[in-house]
Amino acid sequence: GHIQHILRLAIKGGNIDLKITGLENIPAENGFMMYANHQGMFDVLAIAASCDAPMGAVLKKELYDIPFLHQIAVCTKSFAMDREDVRQSLTVIQQVTEEVKQGRAYLIFPEGTRSRKGNEMLEFHGGSFRCATKSKCPVVPVALVDSYKVLDEKGSKPVTLQLHYLAPIPY
């Protein structure tokens, strides 16, 4: 769609070489969940630009409060999760589960926050997999390599970002 086209132009204009492997691993139909490591703010944009499936994401509540991001979240049927509010989190899990059952894809970062250690991953939050188990859908693991370099404050040097869609794990 239009958002995807804009994202692809931004990537090209932003001096980013996006190397993508495994697009054939993205299910062509029915809903699924993508679980990716989280290195930086650019992660969602890289995945959204490369994945043709209608996709939403589960965001931390603080991002949903930023006006421009809020509009994009609404347009993509993304949901904000308040990690301090268990009842609200359960509601989001139920909403995502229903959307996945209707054929939509959702992206979750199971680390819950960005790793500040380059390509090193943080521990996963166990609850982040509830959407996949409740919706009984395939899980597509996504590996991002060097995306932390993209919005680095050091300037506008060319960056090569690797994005790997791994084989789906069936329910």
Residue ranges and their predicted role:
Residues 38-40, 111-115:
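Short glycine-rich anion-binding loops that position phosphate/pyrophosphate groups of nucleotides
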Residues 13-21, 89-90, 145-147:
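Short gly/ser/thr-rich secondary-structure transition/capping motifs
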Residues 31-33, 105-109:
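Residue-level preference for the first positions of well-ordered beta-strands
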Residues 68-71, 101-107, 116-171:
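A cross-family acyltransferase "interaction/gating" segment
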